[in-house]
Amino acid sequence: MSNQLNTMDIKEILKFLPHRYPFLLIDRVLDFTPGETLHAIKNVTINEPFFQGHFPVQPVMPGVLILEAMAQATGLLAFKTMSEEPSNDALYYFAGIDKARFKRVVEPGDQLHFEVQMIKERRGIGVFTGVAKVDGEVVCSAEIMCARREISK
């Protein structure tokens, strides 16, 4: 059995996710096991555009963007699980969220770690659990659904 990690750098992430600045919220995948789990990171800096208005005196990353980053991690795991190469023909869309909970704020200088796990997949809809952590402390948890959809041209 190999201890080699499956990683993705930003160049590979850009091949799988359609998001671009300022909405690409995954910087690196540290490890993944198709059909099971994926561990990704987001380095949160003061240069993030959302900090200009949320909030100028006490910058806090919006919770919806933490959830969006978690959804992007599930999309990467879905692609890797289906052994699907990126193309312009299909995307995995954020389809739903349940049981979202926020435990603490995320501030400039934090490194968010996303741990997502595939629970089930049926007819192109995947159900995942996700946890976001900073320094090992849970920031946010949720159950996320994503759906594969053909792109109409």
From Swiss-Prot:
Source taxon at top rank: Bacteria
Gene Ontology cellular component list: cytoplasm; membrane
Record NCBIfam families: fabZ, PRK00006.1
Compartment(s): Cytoplasm
Membership in a protein family: Belongs to the thioester dehydratase family. FabZ subfamily.
Entry's EC annotation: 4.2.1.59
CDD domains documented for this protein: FabZ
Active-site residues annotated for this sequence: 54
Gene3D superfamilies with a match to the protein in the record: Hotdog Thioesterase (3.10.129.10)
Alphabetized InterPro entries for the sequence: FabA_FabZ, FabZ, HotDog_dom_sf
Catalytic activity: a (3R)-hydroxyacyl-[ACP] = a (2E)-enoyl-[ACP] + H2O
Keywords recorded for this protein, A-Z: Cytoplasm, Lipid A biosynthesis, Lipid biosynthesis, Lipid metabolism, Lyase
Name the record gives this protein: 3-hydroxyacyl-[acyl-carrier-protein] dehydratase FabZ
GO terms, molecular function: (3R)-hydroxyacyl-[acyl-carrier-protein] dehydratase activity
GO aspect biological process, one term: lipid A biosynthetic process
Enzyme type, top EC level: lyase
Function (record text): Involved in unsaturated fatty acids biosynthesis. Catalyzes the dehydration of short chain beta-hydroxyacyl-ACPs and long chain saturated and unsaturated beta-hydroxyacyl-ACPs.
SUPFAM superfamilies (alphabetical): Thioesterase/thiol ester dehydrase-isomerase (SSF54637)
Organism whose genome encodes this protein: Shewanella pealeana (strain ATCC 700345 / ANG-SQ1)
Listed Pfam families: FabA
